[in-house]
């Protein structure tokens, strides 16, 4: 399951464009859709990314894999998996708040996003200041 760079870029643009069109229609009150329906392109894109990531992580379980090459690679892929799950949690909490399924405080909705941003800043700082190849 390997995608070329052009395919990934095209897929990203397609799902982003579809999501933004649906979002504009919802915000202009032209479409009376549920917020969960608005986020379907985002979730389809995230599902594709999660499947690709899990396949790459499962490739490490092959019998011919040499663990000396890329031991830090599994940590990076685990961070990507955690980041995707945090993004999914934020999207679900945001949709639940916008649909008024819950009376959760808005600051609680943003906790997964804040954790994701803090982790991204930590990884960026680590890659800038501590990784020297």
Swiss-Prot record:
InterPro entries the UniProt entry points to: TM_Fragile-X-F-assoc
Membrane topology: Multi-pass membrane protein
Protein's organism: Mus musculus
Major subcellular location class: membrane
Name of the protein this chain belongs to: Transmembrane protein 60
One Gene Ontology CC term in the entry: membrane
Location in the cell: Membrane
Recorded superkingdom: Eukaryota
